[in-house]
């Protein structure tokens, strides 16, 4: 066991493997599984209507920069997007800047908690303003701004919206440089993200391709 702080995802790893039949594989088992994602307001699930079907279809929950830009500037009836920062003052708790910043609750609890509360308030205000696509972004991370752990931001907002009765009115999109492993994406999707733009992972792949490494 490591005595070093870990990314939040690592604390969710299980000590066993569960085999599924059929495999959860939308490529080889496309008849029974799919990776399609839908963005938009679901409305009242107990009273379905035509408006509940007004959604944008994505073939994969992982999207690139162009798709994210299109979603941010969507100009269709029934759709309105906004970007919400998931950052907090590093002086209030980030032990180091960047996407591997470790948050020590003994030091950063108040700063991190305040940032989460602000995120929830911003989301509630956006929903009241008619927004139905919330884009959580850590794009402006820097020396003075540390990112809220993406899994914490997504899961926290998801459960907050459930408690407010507004979760089915919005979709949660994550724009983050933090996730890069299969487990990261699985956890984020499982805890409430509808789409993920892993911009740093995508830029890393592009850089490796340009150098001829892959």
What are these regions (language model features)?
Residues 85-94, 99, 103-214:
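Glycine-rich phosphate/ribose-binding loops and adjacent secondary-structure elements
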Residues 1-89, 94, 100-104, 111-118, ...:
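Extended, highly charged accessory segments
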């Amino acid at each position: 066991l490591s005595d070093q702080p870990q990314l939040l995802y690592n604390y969710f790893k299980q000590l066993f493997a569960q085999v599924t039949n059929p495999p959860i594989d939308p490529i080889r088992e496309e008849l029974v599984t799919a990776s399609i994602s839908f963005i938009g307001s679901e409305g009242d699930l107990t009273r379905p209507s035509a408006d509940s079907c007004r959604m944008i279809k994505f073939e994969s929950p992982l999207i690139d920069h162009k798709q994210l830009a299109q979603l941010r500037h969507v100009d269709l009836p029934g759709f309105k997007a906004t970007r919400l920062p998931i950052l907090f003052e590093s002086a209030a708790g980030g032990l180091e800047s960047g996407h591997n910043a470790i948050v020590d609750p003994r030091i950063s609890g108040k700063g991190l908690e305040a940032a989460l509360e602000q995120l929830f308030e911003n989301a509630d205000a956006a929903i009241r303003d008619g927004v139905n696509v919330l884009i959580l972004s850590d794009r402006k991370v820097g020396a003075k701004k540390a990112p809220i752990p993406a899994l914490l931001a997504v899961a926290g907002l998801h459960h907050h919206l459930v408690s407010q009765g507004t979760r089915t009115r919005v979709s949660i999109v994550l724009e983050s440089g933090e996730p890069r492993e299969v487990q990261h994406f699985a956890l984020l999707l499982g805890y409430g993200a509808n789409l993920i733009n892993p911009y740093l992972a995508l830029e890393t792949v592009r850089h490796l391709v340009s150098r001829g490494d892959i």
